[in-house]
């Protein structure tokens, strides 16, 4: 896979991290439950860090990170629904990253993507645990 193709995939990943950062930050602002809000705030910070890692990989390969994002469905104050949506976003992100790991033959990129996968799995687990406590 050439650099342009790698950059294209990394920009798709970057877009997902940007959207997650925006959604999680918003949810952390509006959710009254302090424990859940802080958990989501921490995940938002992780997602932003992932953006930095991806931007570094993109620029090292001659590309520019795209700040374009899709439509973000912001939740109102339904904590359970917010957690369900976040679990879904993490699951989708994990699948996308796992697919990209199989497609990309750049050792540095694959190493970073695997690390991000591990963090996304942790987020998903933590969100699931909080959701179970609310049931």
Task: List PLM regions with ranges.
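Non-heme di-metal
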Residues: 1-135
């Amino acid at each position: 896979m050439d650099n342009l193709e790698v950059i294209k995939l990394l920009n798709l990943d970057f877009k997902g991290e940007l959207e997650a950062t925006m959604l999680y930050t918003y949810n952390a602002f509006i959710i009254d439950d302090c424990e859940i809000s802080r958990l989501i705030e921490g995940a938002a910070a992780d997602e932003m860090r992932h953006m930095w890692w991806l931007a570094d990989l993109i620029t090292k390969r001659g590309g520019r990170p795209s700040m374009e994002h899709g439509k973000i469905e912001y939740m109102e104050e339904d904590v359970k629904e917010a957690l369900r949506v976040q679990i879904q976003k993490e699951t989708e992100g994990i699948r996308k990253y796992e697919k990209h790991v199989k497609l990309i033959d750049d050792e540095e990129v694959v190493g970073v993507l695997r690390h991000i996968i591990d963090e996304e799995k942790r987020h998903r687990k933590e969100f699931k645990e909080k959701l179970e406590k609310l049931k």
